Amino acid sequence: MSKTGGNDSKSTLYCSFCGKSQHEVRKLIAGPTVFICDECVELCMDIIREESKSSLVKSRDGVPTPKEIRRVLDDYVIGQDFAKKVLSVAVHNHYKRLAHATKHNDVELAKSNIMLIGPTGSGKTLLAQTLARILDVPFTMADATTLTEAGYVGEDVENIILKLLQASDYNVERAQRGIVYIDEIDKISRKSDNPSITRDVSGEGVQQALLKIMEGTVASVPPQGGRKHPQQEFLQVDTTNILFICGGAFAGLERIISQRGKGTSIGFGASVQAPDDRRTGEVFRSVEPEDLLKFGLIPEFVGRLPVLATLEDLDEEALKKILQEPKNALVKQYQRLFEMENVELTFQDEALSLVARKAIERKTGARGLRSILETILLDTMYDLPGLESVEQVVIGPEVVEGKSRPLFIHGDRNKEAPASVSA
């Protein structure tokens, strides 16, 4: 729709949906008799994206197919093809098992909890979070390093179930179909290979405490959290159908895997072992349950995690893609922040390569990318709101290296430029 203001010779165009004029928006798109602004287009895209989450291709039992789960994982997580395939199949089978639980009683299908093994910043946590988003089930994350046996200072393992209950708005039925991700699981390994007479309350003790809730038990949870009191009423949560995903970096596990089967010998006649020059992620692909036992996990705990998915180190190319391609890519996030100041942010390709190399040098993986970008853009984000005529900021390789400041491209902002109209 278009309106004419007073006796103006030039008509002012308005968005047919929100009513904003062409002076208030960046772009108007013209149809046969209507106009739509860029802000409304963006809002429509958000609505479509939300609806597409609930329109996943379902198999006959109402569970998303492994290929569909994998496709959505690809939107958020770059690389890690093997881990995505393992997770897609395991999660599909888990929820298919729940869908058929009451139909066939002749065969009891066991739960398949998942162990994610991969270097720091390789995407373990993001994979678990994305799975919960795809399946629209309650999700909670726990840090294994804060857990202790019941009766000791620290978090009880039952607090994990309480967090899941809170994530489901205290809907017990939904919580019982949720996903729990326990991070830093390698930090609760037994302190030595041999059982000790001293109590290991944050290592083996936590593994023992986790066994029952991972296997399936009815946990008594205080409805509003806090410590248990005798007069307090408890919510009963059955953990049998909760999917547990445990993840850890397992620093040092690659040495255990490499040494397996080689044997040891000493003396002048000893054979010289060539060092394993494979990357950590490649070595992890050969992991066996016996390696996890040597690392310090108890046999019963390893047995509760039958599905092993390993993640690889992220190389420079993968880190560059992570910066640019996912829906929540860091470059897109910062570009949106700059757009709010009506400034276009541009990264040169070589600059992104240098950012990726810095993350590899720091051994922080994808997790370290944000802090690197934050450091690069700090001064610019500090100065920009006070500058009048900046239209574009360009980040080159010299900026990443700290040798120069970003390039500011100025324009004439004295004139209020109306939104451009596309037919």
UniProtKB/Swiss-Prot annotation:
- CDD domains linked to this entry: RecA-like_ClpX
Alphabetically sorted, this entry's keywords are: ATP-binding, Chaperone, Metal-binding, Nucleotide-binding, Zinc
Single GO cellular component term: HslUV protease complex
Q: Where, by residue number, does ATP bind?
A: 119-126
PANTHER family per the UniProt record, alphabetical: ATP-DEPENDENT CLP PROTEASE ATP-BINDING SUBUNIT CLPX-LIKE, MITOCHONDRIAL, ATP-DEPENDENT CLP PROTEASE ATP-BINDING SUBUNIT CLPX-LIKE, MITOCHONDRIAL-RELATED
Q: Give the family from UniProt.
A: Belongs to the ClpX chaperone family.
What does the UniProt record say this protein does? Answer: ATP-dependent specificity component of the Clp protease. It directs the protease to specific substrates. Can perform chaperone functions in the absence of ClpP.
Tell me the subunit arrangement. Answer: Component of the ClpX-ClpP complex. Forms a hexameric ring that, in the presence of ATP, binds to fourteen ClpP subunits assembled into a disk-like structure with a central cavity, resembling the structure of eukaryotic proteasomes.
- The protein's name is ATP-dependent Clp protease ATP-binding subunit ClpX
